Amino acid sequence: MYTDKECYLAGEELWVKVSVDDEALPGNGLSRVAYVEICDTAQVRAQAKVSLTDGTGWACIRLPQTMHSGMYQLSAYTRYMRNWKADSYPRKHIAVLNVRSVSDEDKLVRNDSTAFQKGGVAAASANPNLMSDKKVYGLREKVSLEWTSAWEDAKELTLSVVRKDCEVLVPQPETASPEPNQGERWVAECEGHIVTARVIGDQLPASLLTQLSCVGKEMNMYEGKKKAEGLYRFYTHGVTDQQDIVLSAQSNDGKAFRMEVESPFVELLPNTLPALHCLYQDSALIARSVALQLAQAMPKAVLPKKLEEKIYGQLPSKTYNLDEYVRFNTVEECMVEFVMGTTIDRKGNQKVIRMLQEDAKDFNLFPALVLVDGVAFYNHSEVLAYNARQVQYIHQYRGSFALGEMFYGGILSLITHRGSMPDMRINDDMQMLAYEFPQERPVFHMPAYGNPEIKASRKPDFRHTLYWAPSVQGQEGVEFYTSDLAGTYEATLQGISEDGKKIEVKCEFEVR
């Protein structure tokens, strides 16, 4: 595990990189998800799921404002690692300072520089393996960092540049050798995150149709696989970040059941944690706290996500952009007026949508699978009565599709402008909740001041972490810009050498 720094303020962002391999635990390298926890001896304070590609991934965790000052344990593991005892999971200590409130839980010892010299913390000296092009920079000025080519064979090289305004003594915990766990066996998450949910009830039928759908402009719908009495697993793939999900469980006779999602985290609480020994200046922490409050008030940059229109690897046979047509009040009116290749039949008191079979030149005997923002609705009458002004696209997927034990004669997918099923009433057998999927390599945002107009902008830039690169493999240098926060900055390059030893080199520069 690698973090951007060792000491944080409550409310700051923590950037963490996780790497797994097969050396210690054969088979662990197949994992596509890692779990990160930040705990004290009382409770879990923050958690995150990390998406892994080729055994590596990273995440950004916002530390809660309520965290007390003290030392915390940061631990990481995969689902497959739960076959071994928890004391073998990688762990490290991090320091957190809460400058806005004092708590009885605070475990903080403020030291002077003499105590730190005795404790083994010394000032960083010039390192020929990592050098900046200058020793002193101005505000919003370009910085060039270079390092020796001797590290070209190193693995998992990570670079961070942070303001040096707080020194802490951080003793690292010892990790035990892996010992097998007795009991339940845990399979690796080879394709993606496995969501586990339990059906609530005393007398459950032997067979239930359980589904998990992600609300959005893409189709992410999964059928639950029964693993034990009332316990179902949903094997997701490619779903990342926070999503609104819809869970449903229904018996063959139509009876609805409630489901609860089970936490995938172990909740590794340490028995003891050392007190936090810290050296800092009040003025530096006040400036850092003000910078944190400004950063939280500023809107964050969000990169647009490319939408995937394929369903089961198939592109839409026909797409209707409703913004290009005369607006009607209901979806049924749109279907009748201009959507071709579909028909509306009646089955008792319910309306059923069927799609055209091109090979047979007739409408399919099986009903269509109707989706609204990725969520399946089996009562087609409700969809047909939906406000068409909310809908942007209607996608048709012709052919035959199987979902669990059910067959469908095509898919009709309605995508709304907002992608969140606005004003759509969910059925009694559905539950909607927010769920955090693994983070997919979040981007560290930093401004570039090469343009004089941007450099002269009055928009504040109080970045405490100037630069964070979870992977600088194959590079021999980077460029970035300083912020409006003056002080001493420390660059740290970390990694693993070819023979498996830890690499860590540092250098310092001033910003005035």
Identify the function of each model-found stretch.
Residues 3, 40, 216, 372-373:
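Structural motif
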Residues 5-9, 29, 64-69, 78-343, ...:
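Surface-exposed, low-complexity/disordered segments
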Residues 354-397:
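Periplasmic plug
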Residues 19-26, 199:
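Short amphipathic, basic-aromatic surface patches that mediate peripheral association
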Residues 2, 46, 131, 380-382:
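Short, solvent-exposed loop/turn positions at domain surfaces
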Residues 13-15, 51, 57-64, 72:
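Ligand-binding face of N-terminal immunoglobulin V-set domains in extracellular IgSF glycoproteins
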Residues 35-39, 158-160, 211-213, 369-371, ...:
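Beta-strand signatures of extracellular beta-sandwich domains
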